[in-house]
Amino acid sequence: MQLFNGSVHTCYSYRRHQYEQSEEYLAKLQEEEQVKGVFGRYVDADLSTGKIRDYEIPLTWYQKYLGGRGIGLRILLEEMNGDEDPLEEDNIIVFSVGPLQGTGVAGAGRYAVISKSPKTGSLNDTYAGGFFGHELGTSGYDGIIIRGKAPKPVYLSLVDGKPELHYAHSLWGQQVVDTENALKEKHPGVRVASIGPAGENLVKFACIISDRNRAAARPGFGSVMGSKNLKAIAVRGGIQKSLHDAQMLAEVRKRLVQELTTNADIVAFGKGGTASCVHVFNDEGLLPTKNFQEGVFDGIAAIDAGTSADFKKLLVGNDNCTGCPVRCKLKVDGEFKGQAIQAAYGAPEYETLAALGSNCMNDDIAGICYANQLCNAYGLDTMSTGVTISFLMEASEKNLIDEKINWGDAKAIVQLIEQIARREGIGDLLARGVDYVAKELGADFAMHIKGQELAMHDPRGKRALGISYATTPRGANHMEALQDDGAENLGKYGTPEIGVYGPIDRLAWKDKSRYCKKFTDLGSFSNSAIVCTYIGWDGVLLMDYNPYPRIREALYATTGLEIGVCEMLSIGERTFNLLKLAAAQQGYTRDDDKLPERFQEPLPRGMSRGEVVCEELLQEAIDDYYRLRGWDRLGPTDQKLSELDMTEFIGFIDRKA
């Protein structure tokens, strides 16, 4: 097949007969009435050859893994052998949605991206909100599989059910807002997920940005897209799913919105979003400060959206995701040293305020907002960026580098972001990630786990978080972790899903392995259903609200699958074990479940003064966690896989080796 033989704008020819075959398959799937709410297929685009086909999903995969993360991981374990380099053409990247995307259910305006991570070297996943996920959920497909590497920059459009590849030469080098504007002009009504210059330049922690300010961040998938010469994906849907019970779904949607808009905790959260939570962690003495050397930041009053007068002057409103009345995404407008801060890029979330603020000793809120804007424009993960810069500041303080980079220097932070994205000067070194930089400098204070920079949560005052950090195959990821401070409310609000019937002391080790497993399974289920963190498990943790009965009702109305509490947790456990199987394939073992040595240093002040992670107690808890999981030192045993109805993976781990 000859490349670039289409029109001026279309790189690869469009093969209609493939879609006719898929339409017959889709009709058959819906006639069988076994699983509604799905299209039963993914776009499968090979950028090396230019061929686009449909990838049909077995019904049993939906029944076992539901969607989102689960289906994406199952595809990759089917199609990859583990030898792939994350930034070479044999890696595969999957954009995936679940049954609820495209239905308008509050909290379901999200999508998943799954691939082999240049940060951890294993399969990993990330999520973003906004409107792209909803559009993909009405596209006629449940996701998009990208293989190979295009000979020239391209983008993929999926408009009215028809996927096509187009030249993207004019878009290469553009920041994400410019890319989005150009694609919306060319394809009216599309939603766009794209990379900026950081992804093009293969920065290890480059991310994917959709809707201008929603980041699919952490594992470095912006660089995976860049390595494939894939600039963007533009989707316009409008294709309705076949629902099990449309009337019931409408009633559940209405009831969920009513509950969200009348819950005082959720309404308050919507006004300030995560940016109003910074002081909470500071009060606990657990706000990452000075590269995690401290847990209290003296400049806290300047960077919390709820307390900072300067922050409030920058705020210009709130934004939402598809179908969600909470509207927790803040917008800012202003300037930093003569540079415009634009509302289109959104306000910094908690993680960004900590990573580029307190952890760098930076209390210049305008500087943080502008740094956040640059990260979104260039397509950089703000957490990894902040952790890497704070490491550099400490290295400078300890005279490990020639450059003088002072703590709290907002201007220097902005300059370093520019250098990282463009891979200029010292930015070329930093672009490789904090683990690489630490090895080059011979430093032992890099804050990462399995190559992934730390999230902005300190396990010295959260025992279950430490277990999760150490054991998750995702690296230093907090998004499925039990946040012990929030768990002190679990008994108050009641959470039968994870077997909690009384208050949990954040500093106690007792039962934390069990809580960690249950909560991780709950979060893993949420990531297969793809429901918002803050309506999902954070609703359980932080607010007087348990959304999971409504989520299960919505899934039944959509799919016809009766998912009780036990099956909900089983779906989560299955999908989490897919991650563990992939990690075992890459050689990860029980020996790799470690935390940075800094967490054995006591916090110097604040409510958590003197707290450390006791290595002996942590290792005992991890042993208990492995026992509860049914894992040996390599991963899930064959007995556990059989219990989870994952018999196709028996023998997947080579225990003889």
Please tell me what each predicted stretch does.
Residues 15-16:
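Basic polycationic patches enriched in arginine
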Residues 22-222, 227-301, 582:
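Protein-protein interaction/assembly regions in multi-subunit complexes
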